[in-house]
Structures are given as C-alpha cells and as structure tokens.
C-alpha cells in the first residue's frame, strides 16, 4: 500500500469532494437557505451531499456560473420555461431538461424517474419536480425541487 501524504494539496482537495453545505428550500419563495448548526455551516456528505448537488444543479440557471472551475454548461434550462403558460408540454420539457442535467452528473449511475407536477395550490411555486436516481454506489436516492 502506498503511503498517503496528508499534507499534500491534492489530498486536502480530494478530502473536500462530496462534502457540501446543507441547503433547504424556503417554502415561501423560490430561494434556498443555508443551514447552520452550532453557529457554523451544516456540512453534509455521502448521499445527502448527492441530493444537495442535484438540487443545486437543477436550481442553477443554465450557463449562470462564470467561474472557469465549473463546466461552462453547468445548470438547467428549466428556468427558460418557468414564465411560460402552464401546460403538459412545458411539464414534459421540464422533465427532459432535468433528466439531461442528472445524466451529466458523475455520481449518478441511472436516472430512474422524473415526475413534474402542477403546483395548483402553491402561489410561490408553479411546478414540483420529483427525482429518483441510482448512484454509482447503487443506492437509490429520491428528492424533490419546487420551481
């Protein structure tokens, strides 16, 4: 077994991968709130980190991030549709755009299901997106995002 250089920049960088600051949706608007615990950011890892990353990818506008560290095509095109009149075709396009974003994520093995619902009783959100995926570690992860 090769020795590990715990002080190397590569080790420190890779140690932080798949660890994220926990975010949760604000039910009253289309924003997300950072979560805190004991006066500091709440950090999630593993499958919670993947669920968090999926939410971030879906909620980020396509090509919104200008930082070269990120892929220039990061984000989801659903935001082009949120002002369109509600219809079944718009729901199918939202599902298509979300599926494309999830298929690009390295930690996702299979996109099992995307369901887009019409949030008729919610004035803050027009649509709900439910996702069900299988991670590269063969764990099934589900979650949802409101648009």
Walk through the language-model features, giving the residues of each.
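Immediate N-terminus of the mature polypeptide
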Residues: 1-93, 100, 112, 117-147
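Acidic-histidine catalytic/liganding microenvironments
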Residues: 105-111
């Amino acid at each position: 077994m090769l020795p590990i250089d715990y002080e190397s920049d590569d080790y420190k960088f890779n140690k932080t991968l798949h660890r994220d600051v926990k975010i949760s949706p604000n039910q009253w608007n289309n924003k997300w709130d950072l979560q805190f615990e004991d006066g500091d950011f709440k950090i999630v890892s593993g499958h919670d980190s993947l669920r968090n990353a999926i939410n971030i990818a879906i909620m980020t506008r396509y090509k919104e991030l200008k930082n070269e560290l990120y892929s220039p095509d990061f984000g989801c095109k659903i935001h082009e549709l949120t002002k369109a009149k509600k219809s079944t075709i718009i729901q199918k396009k939202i599902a298509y755009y979300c599926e494309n974003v999830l298929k690009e994520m390295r930690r996702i093995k299979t996109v099992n299901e995307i369901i887009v619902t019409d949030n008729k009783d919610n004035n803050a959100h027009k649509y709900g997106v439910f996702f069900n995926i299988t991670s590269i570690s063969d764990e099934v992860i589900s979650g949802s995002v409101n648009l």
